[in-house]
Amino acid sequence: MKTFELYSSSICPICQRRIPMRIYEDEKDNVIYLEKTCPEHGKFEDVYWGDAELYKYFFENWNHAKYIGEGVENPHSKIVKGCPFDCGLCPQHKTHTVLGIIDVTNRCNMACPICFAYAGKANYVYEPSFGQIAEMIKLLRENSPWQCNALQFSGGEPTLRNDLPELIAEAKKAGITHVEVNTNGIRLAEDIKYFKKLKVAGMSTVYLQFDGLREEVYKKLRGRGDLVSIKKKVIENARKIGCNSIVLVVTLAKGINDNELGSIINFAIENHDVVRCVNIQPISMAGRAKKEEMRRLRITIPDALKLIEEQTGKISRYDWRPVNWPMPIAKGMEMLKGEAYPEFTMHPMCGASTFILVEEGNKNSYSYAPITKYIDVDHFAEVFWRVYYLSLRGEKTKAKLEMLKFLPDIKSKLIRELIKGVVTKGNYEALGKLMNNVIMLGIMHFQDVWNFDIARVQRCAIHYALPDGKLRSFCTYNNLYRDEIEKRYSVSIEEWKARKKKEITEYA
């Protein structure tokens, strides 16, 4: 029986043509599936969301018109073929850049079996020059109406570049407030001086690959079994240099590390002086399989939420909210402070997050609870919507009173004072102080060609800045554009080695 039904568009996994897609509920297993048919390559089925009840909870509450953005005022491409084939961003895109990504190299000192973006597989080196990267940063900062202020340097392995500290400094000089480095951590574990250079240059956060606490996990996902000690050494070195913002980034694979989520969260809590977030990324799929087989292999956002519920016993699946939940906070603060804020107008099915408040006990013991135990987050969001609409009518004093009336309802004094600081100061530093007292848990399910939903793509807020002068959404770039762009701006491995007098796995 199929009770919930919705229509969108997708692409054929084989020829990439745009095709209609149906999203529907199968009551037999409480799962949301998708099906799409290419006139040339036939029918494809996949799991869209692993829990129909959670899907409808997110979709019905956070897919309203007021959660849909208007995109950028200065798109970099025209509509010719239609989404996703004009990505640049084009006028069809509905969300501005909340996080920019720049791949500074495709070289890497690992050869992960699951990776799609390193030189050893590609047989060429993609490594934009300092000048090209400076132009990409400028491209992000020229976005209108929101000048992107958060940037991730990624790869490949970005720490293979000796000039990464200078690139970070360049981003800070251009007005980027938050600069994070996406890394496997090997160089940060081995070379504390280099780690310190990154911090001194202005690195805000280490976005650390962290798939679990057992070497068997890394053997399967990363092809080597000596990485747990390396991850722990990065944590240790972070303390030594005063870096107190590490995100543990979990590539989640069914049957490999899906039983590790509780222990990873506990590890974050034990190291909450430096760990600010655990971000979970369900692995993308490759290859064609039947519907039943895809259900066995595919792990989706609600699957992970239920695993966390089971493994922690403290964090319920209903303690999470979709990634666009902060939208009213941005709109309300914009009206109160008279300045722009990033608008989280992503599709509610793209991800979810919650926060946990950690309290220290005796003898290095910690207790924690999700933020929903201290604050009615949905009422909090509604208060900010009221603040926004009252301010629109010119009633700012009344809007501020609405906010003040809500503060006594917050059960935690710490959270109450921190939220008061965010509201009254309304700047990035105040928000950072709030984050320093809690751990964020996040999950983002990046798409592959099998579950590709154009409705999601058009609302993506994570955009690659590229040397051709365009911005492309994360899932569009990785599925449709990466190979072509990298090849266009690459050199052969032999040419790179001759120029640098180094192997491609060495620091240069």
Residue ranges and their predicted role:
Residues M1-V80, D86-G88, A340-A508:
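Radical SAM enzyme core and accessory elements
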Residues N30-D51, F59-W62, K66-T183, R187-K193, ...:
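Conserved alpha-helical substructure of the radical SAM core
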Residues Y33, L99, T205, V247, ...:
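Broad gene-expression machinery/nucleic-acid interaction feature
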Residues I102-V104, F116-A119, G155, T183, ...:
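Glycine-rich, histidine-containing beta strand-loop boundary motifs that form or position
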Residues Y118-N123, L213-E216, M285:
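A short, flexible beta-alpha/helix-coil linker loop
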Residues A119-E127, K220-G225, E293-M294:
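Short glycine-enriched, charge-decorated loop/helix-capping segments at active-site entrances
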Residues A134-Q152, R161-P282:
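Radical SAM/AdoMet-radical enzyme domain recognition
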Residues K240-E429:
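Radical SAM enzyme [4Fe-4S]-AdoMet core and its adjacent flexible, acidic
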